């Protein structure tokens, strides 16, 4: 088996019987006995492969995260971690202003990752605040703000997260 990273796959290659037998990336075509799709919950490749449509909004969440750079000693001191250990916190209720979802924070050696995850349906309906505002509010919460004080934001990211379990996986 061979794993190839960093190549955007444009389409799947099918043989005469319709079996997937590889991928197409730009002008390159790579054949394979097995192709594993890793393009996320809203997979355009799965739609192409088996006609799978995007999952319902009620079964998908959106997560946003920021990474705050601090030196290793500051991270350990602020989160009361022993040498070589880390911490992980989960937040419910106030982190998403009462709508479906929650917040999270975990340590890395020289940084703290902080984020929120909330249902897309709640975001689209206008029931809650926008997800970016939820993250801003969490960053300013009196329990969180001192932990990231004077830290430099070095990364922002966002992802769609499946919440429907195996029931929303496309058929094989």
Where in this protein do the model-derived segments appear?
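N-terminal Rossmann-like dinucleotide/flavin-binding domain of flavoprotein oxidoreductases
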Residues: 1-2
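A conserved short coil-to-beta-strand element within the FAD-binding core of flavoproteins
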Residues: 5-19
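Hydrophobic residues embedded in beta-strands of well-ordered beta-sheets
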Residues: 19-21, 112-113
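Core beta-strand elements of the Rossmann-like FAD/NAD(P) dinucleotide-binding domain
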Residues: 25-34
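Flavin (primarily FAD) binding-site architecture
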Residues: 37-52
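Central beta-strand plus flanking loop segment that forms part of the substrate or channel wall
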Residues: 50-85
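Active-site substrate-recognition segment that forms the wall
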Residues: 85-121
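FAD/FMN-dependent oxidoreductases across multiple families
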Residues: 97-99, 122-172
């Amino acid at each position: 088996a061979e794993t190839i990273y960093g190549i955007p796959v444009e389409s799947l290659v099918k043989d005469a019987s319709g079996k997937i037998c590889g991928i197409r990336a730009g002008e390159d075509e790579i054949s394979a006995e097995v192709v594993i799709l890793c393009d996320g919950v809203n997979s355009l490749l799965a739609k192409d492969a088996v006609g799978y449509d995007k999952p319902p909004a009620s079964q998908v969440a959106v997560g946003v995260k920021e990474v705050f750079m601090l030196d290793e000693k500051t991270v350990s001191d602020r989160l009361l971690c022993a040498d070589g250990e880390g911490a992980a916190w989960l937040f419910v209720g106030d982190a998403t202003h009462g709508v479906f979802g929650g917040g999270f924070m975990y340590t890395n050696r020289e940084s703290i990752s902080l984020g929120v995850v909330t249902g897309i349906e709640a975001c689209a309906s206008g029931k809650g605040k926008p997800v970016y505002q939820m993250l801003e509010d969490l960053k300013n919460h009196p329990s969180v703000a001192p932990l990231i004080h004077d830290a430099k934001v070095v990364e922002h990211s966002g992802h769609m997260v499946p919440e429907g379990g195996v029931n929303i996986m496309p058929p094989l």
